Amino acid sequence: MSFYEELKWRNLIKDSSDEKELKNLLDCKKIKFYCGFDPTSDSLTVGHLVQLTMMSLLEKQGHSPFILVGGATGLIGDPKETEERKLLSLETSLQNAKSLETQLKKILFQKKITFLNNYEWFSQLDIITFLRKYGKLFNINYMLNKQTVAKRLSSGISFTEFTYMILQSLDFHHLYKNYGVQLQLGGSDQWGNITSGLELIRKLETTSHAFGLSTPLLLNANGTKFGKSEQDVLWLDPQKTSPYKIYQYFLNLADEEVVNCLKQLTLIPKEEILELEKATLQTPQKRLAQKALANNIVNLIYSQKVLQECHKTNEVLFLNKKKESFQEADFTLLNKTLFSYETSLVSIPLSEALVKTQLTTSKREAREFIQRGSIQIFNEKIKNPDYLIDKKNTLFNKYVLLKKGKKNNSLIILN
C-alpha cells in the first residue's frame, strides 16, 4: 500500500486537485505543505485532531509542514453557514493566535514545523493595492457559487465576510511564492477557499505546481459535528475541558464510530487497527478499540502522566461504589481531573452546583435532570429540585461528588 493509498484507507481524503500528480508527489517526492488555523478562539477542539493527524502522517513521510495561524483572517471571519460572525478585536485575535501556536507546539513538539502568522503580510497591504492587484482577479459569479457563500445569500452576507475567500487565496499564493509551499490542507468546508487559492496561483504565476487536499469533517454516527458533548465543545485546552472528560468521551464512543476514529485520529498502524476492529466485532464488551483510542489521544494532546491520572480517576470513581470507601487522597486527584467548584459558602443549592460544575447549562435544565432521577450525590439519588447541599453531604468535611447519569462526574468543595 502506497502512502497516498494509506491516507485514503484512513478516510483522510475528501477532495483533491489533480489526484494523479498529487499522489506521485506524496508517494515519491518531498514537498512543503500547510494547514491554517484561524484564532476565533484561544483553543483548538477535538474536531481539529483530524488535521493534526494528517499533518503528522505527512511529516512522518518526509514532507515539510507549515502551520499558518490567521492573525489577520481571524479579524475578518470565515463565513458561517447560518449567521454573521462577531468581529474580534485586534488584541483578542493576536492573543488567541499566540495561544493556538503554543498549543500546537505542545501537541506536535517532536515535529519540525514552521509557524507563520498572516497578520505579518496583511498588515502591510493597503486597500488600493488589494483591490487593483487582487480584486480584479476574482469573478463575483465564481465566488457566489462557492458553497459557504451560496448558503448565506438568502439570509445575507457582509462584504467583510465575502472577502474572506480572497484573503485565504492570498495566503496560499504568499506561501507558494515566498516559501515554496505546494500543498494546502483543510477541512472539506474549506474546499472552495482552497480551490480559489489554486486559481489565484495559476493566474499570477507563469507555472503552477500547487495542489489542494481536503479532509472529511468528523461526524458522529447520527450526522452531527464530532466533538460536541451534551453541553459544549470539547476543547483541547485543559483549562476549558478537563483531559478526563476528553478521555471519557472517546472511551464511551459507539462501536460503529470507533474504528473510523482510530484511522483518522491516531497514528496506530493499519495492522493494529484491523485487529482492534476484529476485537470490536467479536468481544465488544471489552471495548479494546475505545481504550486504545482514548489512550492514544490523551497521550498525544497532554502527556503520559495525564493519561495515568485519567486511568487512576476511573479506578477511583468506578471501584469506590460506596461513599465510605473513598480515601482523602482520592479527592486530591479528582480535584485535578474533574471539573470542580470551590465555595466558601456552607451550603449551595444542588441545581446551582450542577451549573457551576458544568454538568448542566442552566438551573432549569438542572431541575429537569433532578426530577428525572438522573442526579446523584455520591451514590444517593436526589429527586428534590430544591435540594440544598451542605456539610451533611461531604466527605472529609468538604468534598461532595456529583454524578449525572453513569458517566458524568464533578466535584463541589465546601470550605
Curated annotation (Swiss-Prot):
**GO aspect biological process, one term:** tyrosyl-tRNA aminoacylation
* First-listed, main subcellular location of the protein, grouped into a coarse class: cytoplasm
Which positions does UniProt annotate for L-tyrosine binding? Y34, Y164, Q168
**Protein name (record):** Tyrosine--tRNA ligase
User: Gene Ontology terms, cellular component aspect?
Assistant: cytosol
What the entry lists under PANTHER family is as follows: TYROSINE--TRNA LIGASE, MITOCHONDRIAL, TYROSYL-TRNA SYNTHETASE
Q: Where in the cell is it found?
A: Cytoplasm
Pfam families for this protein: SYY_C-terminal, tRNA-synt_1b
Per UniProt, ATP binds at: K228
Q: What PROSITE patterns does its record include? A: AA_TRNA_LIGASE_I (PS00178), S4 (PS50889)
